[in-house]
Amino acid sequence: MKHTSEPTSQPDTQAAESAQSSAAAAGQAASAYSSQAQRASADAQAIAGDEAAVAEATIEPDTAELRRQLEAADEKARQNYENWARAVAEGENIRRRAQDDVARAHKFAIEGFAEYLLPVMDSLQAALADASGDVAKLREGVELTLKQLNAAFEKGRVTELNPVGEKFDPHRHQAISMVPADQEANTVVNVLQRGYTLADRVLRPALVTVAAPK
C-alpha cells in the first residue's frame, strides 16, 4: 500500500501573515490619521480661539467708542434743550415787559402834557379868585395864561395852524367858502378857526376861506 502525503498549508500561512501585516499597517495608518485629525482639530480650535479673541478685542473698542459718542450726543442734546428753554423764557419775559410798557404808555400817555397844563389851570383859578374888577390886571393875567398855554403846547409838540396866505391844503385845512380876492386862486384868504397838529398828525384842521378863481 502506498502512502500518499498530505498537502502542506504554507500558502494559507503566508496569506494569514500577509493579512496580519496589512491589518497592522491599516491600524498604524488609522492611528496616524487619528493623531493628525486630533492635531487638526486642536489647531482649528486654537485658530477659532484666536479669531474670537481678535473679534472681542475689536468689538470692545467699538463699543466703548459708541458709548462715548452716545454720552457726547446726550450732553449736546441736554445743552441744546437748556439753551432753548432759556431762549423761550427770555422771549416770554421780553414779551411781558413789552406788554407792560405798552399798557403804561396807554395809561400815562397824556401824563406829561397834563403836567404842562397845570400852570395854566393855576393862572385861570387865580384870575377867577381876583375880585378887584381891574380890567387891565385881568387882561394881563389872560395874556400870561396864554403864554403858559403856548409853552405847554410847545413842550407837548402841539403846533398851531394859522395858514393865511398859504396854498389850500385839504389835509390840513377845511374850506368853509370860496371868496373873491386879489390872491391867487386856492389861496387861504382868512382863518376863521385855527387848527392844531400833534407832531405830524392833524388834531384839528384850520377853518378857512379860499380865494375863488378869477
From Swiss-Prot:
Gene3D superfamilies: 3.90.20.20, Head domain of nucleotide exchange factor GrpE (2.30.22.10). Keywords: Chaperone, Cytoplasm, Stress response. CDD domains: GrpE. GO terms for molecular function: adenyl-nucleotide exchange factor activity; protein homodimerization activity; protein-folding chaperone binding; unfolded protein binding. Signal peptide: none annotated. Residues 14-57 have a biased composition (Low complexity). It comes from the Bacteria. GO terms for cellular component: cytosol. The keyword Magnesium does not apply. InterPro entries: GrpE (IPR000740), GrpE_coiled_coil (IPR013805), GrpE_head (IPR009012). Residues 1-61 are annotated as: Disordered. Residues 1-13 have a biased composition (Polar residues). Belongs to the GrpE family. Participates actively in the response to hyperosmotic and heat shock by preventing the aggregation of stress-denatured proteins, in association with DnaK and GrpE. It is the nucleotide exchange factor for DnaK and may function as a thermosensor. Unfolded proteins bind initially to DnaJ; upon interaction with the DnaJ-bound protein, DnaK hydrolyzes its bound ATP, resulting in the formation of a stable complex. GrpE releases ADP from DnaK; ATP binding to DnaK triggers the release of the substrate protein, thus completing the reaction cycle. Homodimer. PANTHER family: GRPE PROTEIN, GRPE PROTEIN HOMOLOG, MITOCHONDRIAL. This is Protein GrpE. It comes from Ralstonia nicotianae (strain ATCC BAA-1114 / GMI1000) (Ralstonia solanacearum).
